[in-house]
Structures are given as structure tokens and as C-alpha cells.
């Protein structure tokens, strides 16, 4: 593990004391960082300062300082590109390969809408994929006369290689593009992405990654994964303000890639210009992304933060399943900062309506925010762990579930 920066908080101080850095409601047990993130106070202040700066002279900032629209002499250092360059370094990609988008869904949609699907082609997804993305893929496939196929990945899972083998069996001669997750949303699994991407490449299938839950939660080196596109959020585990996402494309995939909203840059031949300006919008979440990276590096220490969150995730799974007398088989290599564990057997096979009722009761009666899901004939809780969480939060969750009927 790399040494902590001199200003970083010692890992022993992670836990409830860290709530001083976040604007979370007092008294709440927040075990749902993964859904939309929580922005640290210092990053919110950085964003507020950016908004103040913009409003002092909006036209000058948006037209002359934010980026080069081709309408004025280019600024020496366009602010948006400067922020994107810092994020690119964090994710291990070249500066010309990364653009900001509102969220991972926007990035995935841009790729799917730009991809040259023909009638009879196939988009391959998996059954752990985020529902909104699956619906978008189905819509685009229908519009092009293509089909959407889904591969069943194991859950519960015992071996990451089982995911690779399932994917290999699902690829057909018609498969043109596969949509893979880096970290699955409901089931909270870190997939063996490099191996799954290699299986696709060997069969001539392009790979689009939904990395919504990855940056900040696990080590991300996009260039080493061997994928064609990677869409991600920075407002979840990387502490940026909402909404802040990124999209990376391999060099040979950039020329034909276009944003969902076309504007001045569409005839420029410059994909960066196309994505950087899609019309007037609030750029402050994107420009505040470097402040979020600074918070991770200089205040928390990236490795210390991930180490705490990962260890607490494993402890959560062990403690909750022992308390509820359930089993949990996920390999440690497939765990990041979240775990999805089964609720007690007395809740039965469950259904989405029961899951929603239990989630509402946990929040309204016990001030615990945690998703409850219905899957594989059981009810589960997905527990997200961040530096402000500690074992007592899990004890409160266990006791609250015991009180549910």
C-alpha cells in the first residue's frame, strides 16, 4: 500500500467522526452511498465558488474561458479541458480520450446511438445490468431492426470464472456489441472485466462498459482493460457534485461517436468539441471534479479510503449473514465497497412490492437508508460502505431488520 499523504486522515479515524466532512442528516444511518453518492462539504464549497465566478460575468466565462467554441480566439487553457485532463490521469487514460457527460447512462446512450447497428445484429447485455440501461439498449435495438440478447450470470456467485464462461457461451455470430458492468448495481459484484472483455475481443465483439460504480470504489485503469468505451460516474464513489459523469473511447472509436444532443461541434470533426458543448448548461459539477479528487487524495488517502471501505464491506457480509443465519459466497476479488446479502428466511421468497415496503419501513421507522431488492427467490439488502460508516451502523441495520414483520 502506498504511504498516505502527510495531510491525509489516519484510517483509524474513519467512521462516524468523518460525518463532519459531509452534509448528511443528523441521526441517519446512511448505507446507500452507491445510489447517487454524497458530496463532501469542501467539494460543495468549491462548486459554490465556481458558480459565483460564472455569475460575475457569465458570457465571458461560458464563451471565452470554459472552452473554445470556434467563435472566439481559443483560451490559453480551456477550463473544461483542464478539469477533464485531471480526471483522465486519475483513470489512467490519455487526455484526448475522455469527455464529461451528465452520468454513465448518458455515456452509454451516446455510444449505443452512435454504433452502426444493422438489421439482424445483436446487442448482448447480462441479467445483472442496470435496468435503465437495458431499457435504452432494447429501445435502440428495436429502432435499428436489431435484437437484444441477455446472458444469465450466476447469483449467488462462487467463482468469477463462471461469469466469463457464461459470457463466452452467449456470444453468437450476430453479436456486435456487448454491454458489461465493471461493478454491478443491485448485486454489487466486481466483475472480471478484463477477462470478459478479452473473451469478446477474441470473437470480434465490441465492448461498452457501464462503470457507474467503479471510479473511487475500486482501482480503475481503463487503458489496461482492453475495452472500446467506458462510461462512468464521478458523483457516486469519487465525491464529485451531481451530475458528473465521464465517457472514454478508444482512439479508433472516437471519430464516429456523438453526444445525445448535437450542437456547434457536430461539423468540426473534433469529438471533444462535440461533447464539451451541447448547449448552455451548468458546468460547475464537471469543473469541481478536481476538487473531489483532491479530497480523496489529500484528505482521505485513496488507498486508505478503499481499504477501509472494502474491509467494512467484507465485515458487513460476514456479520449480517451470521446474525441472520444465512450464507454468502461472493469471492473477495468480486467485492468492492458494496455487498448484497440475503435477508432472514422468514421474509420468504419476497417480491418487489415487499422489498419496497421493507425499505420504506427501515427509513421511516429506523432512519436507515439501504436498498432492499427481490432477486433469485429471496430478499436482499445492498449495503454501501463509505468512510463515514462503521460497524455500529451494521448493528443498527441488523436490529432494525429483526424488528420488521
PLM region descriptions:
Residues 1-405:
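Pyridoxal 5′-phosphate
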Amino acid at each position: 500500500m502506498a504511504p498516505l499523504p502527510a495531510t491525509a486522515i489516519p484510517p483509524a479515524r474513519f467512521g462516524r467522526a468523518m460525518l463532519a466532512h459531509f452534509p448528511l442528516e443528523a441521526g441517519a444511518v446512511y448505507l446507500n452511498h452507491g445510489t447517487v453518492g454524497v458530496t463532501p462539504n469542501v467539494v460543495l464549497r468549491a462548486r459554490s465558488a465556481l458558480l459565483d465566478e460564472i455569475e460575475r460575468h457569465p458570457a465571458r466565462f461560458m464563451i471565452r474561458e470554459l472552452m473554445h467554441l470556434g467563435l472566439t480566439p481559443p483560451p490559453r487553457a480551456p477550463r473544461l479541458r483542464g478539469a477533464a485532463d485531471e480526471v483522465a490521469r486519475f483513470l489512467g487514460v490519455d487526455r484526448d480520450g475522455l469527455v464529461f457527460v451528465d452520468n454513465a447512462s448518458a455515456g452509454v446512450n451516446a455510444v449505443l446511438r452512435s454504433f452502426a447497428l444493422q438489421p439482424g445484429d445483436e446487442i448482448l447485455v447480462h441479467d445483472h445490468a442496470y435496468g435503465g440501461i437495458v431499457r435504452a439498449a432494447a429501445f435502440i435495438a428495436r429502432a435499428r431492426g436489431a435484437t437484444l440478447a441477455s446472458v444469465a450470470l450466476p447469483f449467488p456467485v462462487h467463482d468469477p470464472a463462471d461469469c466469463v464462461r457464461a459470457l463466452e457461451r452467449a456470444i453468437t455470430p450476430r453479436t456486435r456489441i456487448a454491454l458489461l458492468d465493471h461493478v454491478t448495481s443491485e448485486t454489487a459484484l466486481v466483475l472480471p472485466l478484463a477477462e470478459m472483455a478479452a473473451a469478446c475481443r477474441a470473437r470480434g465483439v465490441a465492448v461498452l462498459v457501464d462503470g457507474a460504480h467503479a471510479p473511487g470504489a475500486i482501482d480503475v485503469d481503463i487503458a489496461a482493460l482492453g475495452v472500446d468505451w467506458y462510461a462512468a460516474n464521478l458523483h457516486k464513489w469519487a465525491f464529485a457534485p451531481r451530475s458528473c459523469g465521464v465517457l472514454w473511447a478508444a482512439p479508433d472509436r472516437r471519430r464516429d461517436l456523438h453526444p445525445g444532443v448535437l450542437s456547434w461541434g457536430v461539423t468540426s470533426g473534433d469529438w471533444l468539441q462535440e461533447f464539451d458543448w451541447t448547449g448552455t448548461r451548468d458546468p460547475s459539477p464537471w469543473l469541481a471534479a478536481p476538487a473531489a479528487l483532491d479530497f480523496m487524495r489529500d484528505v482521505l488517502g485513496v488507498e486508505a479510503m478503499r481499504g477501509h471501505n472494502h474491509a467494512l464491506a467484507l465485515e458487513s457480509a460476514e456479520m449480517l449473514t451470521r446474525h441472520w443465519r444465512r450464507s454468502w459466497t461472493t469471492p473477495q476479488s468480486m467485492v468492492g465497497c458494496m455487498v448484497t446479502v440475503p435477508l432472514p428466511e422468514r421474509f420468504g421468497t419476497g417480491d418487489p412490492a415487499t422489498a419496497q415496503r421493507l425499505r420504506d419501513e427501515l427509513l421511516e421507522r429506523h432512519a436507515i437508508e439501504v436498498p432492499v431488492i427481490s432477486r433469485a427467490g429471496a430478499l436482499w439488502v445492498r449495503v454501501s460502505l463509505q468512510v463515514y460508516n462503521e460497524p455500529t451502523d451494521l448493528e443498527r441495520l441488523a436490529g432494525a431488520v429483526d424488528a420488521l414483520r
